[in-house]
């Protein structure tokens, strides 16, 4: 989708559709009042008649609004004016995007970014609108024999800002928001691709394609022989039962001087998780193709950083394998080595994500990053604790954790911090090895974080457990693209971009 910004009078726009907001109790936004004045009170008449109540997310398409130059006017409900906030704003933009696509307008000028949102400026509104337009209209029909795309999809949208002086701040915000949305959609494509296609080798191919697409991106792929030579024993231990060979995918993005230390992202890339010998129940096992959502999020963040041309250096490390049962597979009770040098007692082969991340973190340390953030669908306990709304966030650097949480607030992609106290770490003691890979049922998300912390020695490190947020089940089944928006805003902050 092509996105632009402008400033102007909604009644004077020559376009297929102008989008304006209407609150409850027949209260109109400034743009709606301008259209109402030009149409000799036409909107007021419709609102008095009850054609639109103004509830958040309601829409009403007017094909022949008198007195204006646009072909159509789309009214979007914004709820009660005094309660209008970030959540209501995003709901209104989402409803507008869907209504425009359904109407087949092809293009539109949205005056929603002119709406005042408590605590947020015009740059935030433009970035949020751009991201929502990209993600709301996402479709994944690659493997349907008759996909039937929209007859006239929304191909161009212009975001109107209140004053011409706002355009200077609106353009970089538009760039960042659209990059976050496109990065999230790229992540969703990877997550939704079935595991018979999205193998570790496929992720390597996607990395090479990303390097071909964007200047400043370079891909490095390590296969089984290189992994053995480099000593990534924990990753190889998880891969023993799989037919598909493992990979370590490394993406380098250079947007700053070479002497600037990179930010490192490490993404769990389990392209299918059967549980291994500790096999999972069959119900919903198809959703275990999403166990590479951490890797997909890291891919999406690199995509967003490269598209926005963020002025920072970034490295992404993705340990990728399947976790399958086989006569060669790692067994419960086995003791395995790791790149870090610590030996791990594997008490449960379905706690494999932390094993590949252990090697991923150790490999990232070799690249001398300024800080490391790992992303993983790591524990079902995260769903018990936080449901499907917030990511679990942990780390050994309070400032880094704070910045991630604040980025999540800006992006409406929120996290919640959990502790990593020593008492939790004690649950990982093993009588036979340096550490056990599970700490029992209590506080499973925290003990998983404690395990990773042992392999993040010497690093400023944070961990995002996205087990509850990476995909949806049921009627709207599919990858969400989270936490790409959070990561994009975090990286933008590290690059000196602020909204």
Swiss-Prot record:
Q: Which GO terms describe its cellular component?
A: cytoplasm
* Catalysed reactions, as listed in the record: Release of an N-terminal amino acid, Xaa-|-Yaa-, in which Xaa is preferably Leu, but may be other amino acids including Pro although not Arg or Lys, and Yaa may be Pro. Amino acid amides and methyl esters are also readily hydrolyzed, but rates on arylamides are exceedingly low; Release of an N-terminal amino acid, preferentially leucine, but not glutamic or aspartic acids
Q: Which domain of life is it from?
A: Bacteria
Q: Where is the active site?
A: 280, 354
Q: Which cofactor does it need?
A: Mn(2+)
Mostly located where?
cytoplasm
Q: Name the residues that bind Mn(2+) 1.
A: 273, 350, 352
Q: Which InterPro entries match?
A: Leucine_aapep/pepB, Macro_dom-like, Peptidase_M17_C, Peptidase_M17_leu_NH2_pept, Peptidase_M17_N
Positions with a binding annotation for Mn(2+) 2: 268, 273, 291, 352
**BP term (GO), one:** proteolysis
Extract the coiled-coil ranges from the record. Answer: none
- Keywords carried by this UniProt record: Aminopeptidase, Cytoplasm, Hydrolase, Manganese, Metal-binding, Protease
NCBIfam families xrefs: PRK00913.1-2, PRK00913.1-4
Protein name (Swiss-Prot/TrEMBL):
Probable cytosol aminopeptidase
């Amino acid at each position: 989708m092509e996105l632009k910004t402008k400033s102007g009078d909604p009644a004077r726009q020559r376009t297929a559709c102008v989008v304006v907001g209407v609150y409850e109790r027949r209260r109109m936004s400034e743009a709606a009042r301008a259209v109402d004045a030009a149409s000799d009170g036409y909107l007021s008449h419709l609102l008095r008649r009850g054609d639109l109540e103004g509830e958040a997310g309601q829409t009403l398409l007017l094909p022949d609004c008198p007195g204006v130059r646009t072909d159509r006017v789309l009214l979007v409900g914004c709820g009660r004016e005094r309660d209008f906030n970030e959540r209501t704003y995003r709901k209104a933009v989402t409803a507008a995007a869907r209504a425009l696509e359904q109407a087949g307008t092809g293009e539109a000028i949205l005056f929603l970014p002119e709406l005042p949102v408590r605590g947020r400026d015009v740059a935030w509104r433009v970035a949020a609108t751009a991201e929502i337009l990209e993600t709301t209209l996402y479709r994944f029909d690659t493997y349907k024999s008759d996909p039937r795309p929209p007859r006239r999809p929304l191909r161009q949208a212009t975001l109107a800002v209140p004053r011409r002086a706002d355009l200077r701040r609106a353009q970089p915000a538009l760039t960042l928001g659209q990059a976050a949305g496109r990065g999230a959609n790229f992540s969703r494509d990877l997550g939704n691709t079935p595991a018979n296609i999205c193998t570790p080798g496929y992720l390597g191919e996607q990395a090479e394609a990303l390097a071909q697409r964007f200047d400043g991106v370079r891909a490095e792929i390590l296969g089984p022989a290189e992994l053995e030579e480099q000593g990534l024993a924990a990753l190889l231990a998880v891969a023993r039962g799989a037919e598909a060979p493992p990979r370590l995918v490394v993406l380098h993005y250079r947007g700053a001087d070479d002497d600037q230390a990179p930010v490192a992202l490490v993404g769990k890339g389990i392209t299918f998780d059967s549980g291994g010998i500790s096999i999972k129940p069959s119900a919903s096992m198809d959703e275990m193709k999403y166990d590479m959502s951490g890797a997909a999020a890291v891919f999406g963040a690199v995509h967003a950083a490269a598209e926005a041309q963020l002025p920072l250096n970034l490295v992404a490390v993705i340990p990728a394998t399947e976790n399958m049962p086989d006569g060669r597979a790692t067994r419960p009770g086995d003791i395995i080595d790791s790149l870090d040098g610590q030996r791990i007692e594997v008490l449960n082969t379905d706690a494999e994500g932390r094993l590949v991340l252990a090697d991923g973190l150790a490999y990232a340390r070799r690249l001398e990053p300024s800080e490391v953030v790992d992303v993983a669908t790591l524990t079902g306990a995260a769903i018990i604790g936080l449901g499907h709304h917030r990511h679990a966030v942990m780390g050994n650097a309070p400032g880094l954790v704070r910045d991630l949480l604040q980025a999540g607030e800006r992006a409406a992609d929120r996290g919640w911090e959990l502790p990593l106290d020593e008492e939790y770490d004690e649950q990982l003691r093993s009588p036979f090895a340096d550490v056990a890979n599970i700490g029992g049922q209590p506080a499973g998300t925290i003990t998983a974080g404690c395990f990773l912390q042992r392999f993040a020695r010497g690093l400023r490190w944070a961990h995002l457990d996205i087990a509850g947020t990476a995909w949806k089940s049921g009627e709207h089944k599919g990858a969400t693209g989270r936490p790409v928006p959070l990561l994009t805003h975090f990286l933008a902050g590290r690059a000196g971009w602020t909204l």
